[in-house]
From Swiss-Prot:
It comes from Escherichia coli (strain K12). Belongs to the ribosome association toxin RatA family. This is Ribosome association toxin RatA. InterPro entries: COQ10-like, COQ10_START, START-like_dom_sf. Pfam families: Polyketide_cyc (PF03364). Associates with 50S ribosomes. The gene is ratA.
C-alpha cells in the first residue's frame, strides 16, 4: 500500500503532457520543423530565444528561452536524433529536477504522418513550480498545435 501511495504521489508531483496529431505533411517535413530549434522564436508562443550549443549528426544540445506573464526561464536539453523518426530530449540544465520526453514521427503515407509529443517533468522546487508551472504546462501543451500551424505556413506556400 505504501508503494502504491508513493506511486500516486510521484504521479501527482511529476506532470506529464502527451499530445498526438495527424497532419498532411510527411514525417521528414515535421521532423525538420521540430529539429529547427533556431526558428522556434518565430512561431512558438512564449519562446523568446533559442540556440544550438553543440551539434553532431545524431545529437544536439540546445537552449530555449521561455517567457510569459513576466516570468522568464531558460532550459537546455540534449536531444538524441533519429533522422525523420524521433527526437528524444533529456535535461542538461534549467529549472527542473527532471525533464525527459520527445517527439515521434510515424509516416502514414508519403504526404501524411502522425506526430506524438510526450513530456515528463518535475521542477526543482515548489516555489519555481508555483511561479512557472502553469506557464510551462500551457506552453508545452500547445506545442503540437504550434508546429502544425507552422507546417501549414512553411509547406503550403511551396
Amino acid at each position: 500500500m505504501i508503494l502504491f501511495v508513493g506511486f500516486l504521489l510521484m504521479e501527482i508531483v511529476m506532470p506529464q503532457i502527451s499530445r498526438t496529431a495527424l497532419v498532411p505533411y510527411s514525417a521528414e517535413q515535421m521532423y525538420q520543423l521540430v529539429n529547427d530549434v533556431q526558428s522556434y522564436p518565430q512561431f512558438l508562443p512564449g519562446c523568446t530565444g533559442s540556440r544550438i550549443l553543440e551539434s553532431t549528426p545524431g545529437q544536439m544540445t540546445a537552449a530555449v528561452d521561455v517567457s510569459k506573464a513576466g516570468i522568464s526561464k531558460t532550459f537546455t536539453t540534449r536531444n538524441q536524433l533519429t533522422s525523420n523518426q524521433s527526437i528524444l530530449m533529456n535535461l542538461v540544465d534549467g529549472p527542473f529536477k527532471k525533464l525527459i520526453g520527445g517527439w515521434k514521427f510515424t509516416p502514414l503515407s508519403q504526404e501524411a504522418c502522425r506526430i506524438e509529443f510526450h513530456l515528463d517533468f518535475e521542477f526543482t522546487n515548489k516555489l519555481i513550480e508555483l511561479a512557472f508551472g502553469r506557464v510551462f504546462k500551457e506552453l508545452a501543451a500547445n506545442m503540437v498545435q504550434a508546429f502544425t500551424v507552422r507546417a501549414k505556413e512553411v509547406y503550403s506556400a511551396r
